[in-house]
Amino acid sequence: MKLVYSTDCEYHIGLKASDIGHYVILPGDPARSEKIAQHFSHPHKVGHNREYVTYTGTLCETPVSVMSTGIGGPSTAIGVEELIHLGAHTFIRVGTSGGMQPDILAGTVVIATGAIRFEGTSKEYAPVEFPAVPDFTVTAALKHAAEDVQVRHALGVVQCKDNFYGQHSPHTMPVHAELTQKWHAWIACNTLASEMESAALFVLGSVRRVRTGAVLLVIGNQTRRAQGLEDIQVHDTENAIRVAVEAVKLLITQDSPR
């Protein structure tokens, strides 16, 4: 079922096909859309409805867009579904995360190679046994971009959750024993970071046959705090944004007819 306004705009994001490029960067924070758009040539705002703030410009003379998704899987899935209706085919999430391994310091850029589906949205797309993995071509482009811009980065699995405070205040939850046991299990499995959107994005991408990827700034590390190690806080997302933008340029070049 496709819901549109009478003006043929998609119902939630308020956009039509001519508003967007086929390559879309997806921050969670609406305020970050404008910051990312400043990396485009000729950026202009094309939409602002609910949590979905959208700018379109060009990279390598190709139309590209940035649209915020808000927090979590449901709003991410709604936004991406509607962008797919409009013809978008490549999506890179740019967001923040919390480090889980003690050597993943704040300021590190994590490129997700898979996501733990500890959330609900992806379960309405595919059985729980189905893996949440990004597109290999997009992930490779993110890796090359991180190397090109020379930022500290790591590749690995991330954990996706629906309850932010279930992670940070598990003792206040009736299911605290399960939350704590699984958290330690994921750390033992070498999960790099925790966030809230990638699992839904990756599974949706597989189901809808579009390309997805994710690059995440680590803003802090509660494992380091628990071990009595220094845990600085880093909130500047510029390095993650640069990696995403350069990856889009690489993908455009690779996709261009030779």
Curated annotation (Swiss-Prot):
| EC numbers | 2.4.2.3
Q: Name one GO cellular component term.
A: cytosol
Cellular compartments annotated: Cytoplasm
This protein's pathway reads: Pyrimidine metabolism; UMP biosynthesis via salvage pathway; uracil from uridine (phosphorylase route): step 1/1
Q: What does this protein do?
A: Catalyzes the reversible phosphorylytic cleavage of uridine to uracil and ribose-1-phosphate.
InterPro entries named among the record's database cross-references: Nucleoside_phosphorylase_CS (IPR018016), Nucleoside_phosphorylase_d (IPR000845), Nucleoside_phosphorylase_sf (IPR035994), Uridine_phosphorylase (IPR010058)
Annotated gene: udp
Family label = Belongs to the PNP/UDP phosphorylase family.
Annotated organism of origin: Treponema pallidum (strain Nichols)
Q: Which reaction does it catalyse?
A: uridine + phosphate = alpha-D-ribose 1-phosphate + uracil
The chain's disulfide connectivity reads none
Name the keywords, alphabetized. Cytoplasm, Glycosyltransferase, Transferase
Which GO terms label this protein's molecular function in UniProt? uridine phosphorylase activity
Q: What is this protein called?
A: Uridine phosphorylase
- One Pfam assignment: PNP_UDP_1
Its organism's taxonomic lineage begins at: Bacteria, Pseudomonadati, Spirochaetota, Spirochaetia, Spirochaetales
Q: What class of enzyme is it?
A: transferase
Which GO BP terms sit in this record?
nucleoside catabolic process; nucleotide catabolic process; UMP salvage
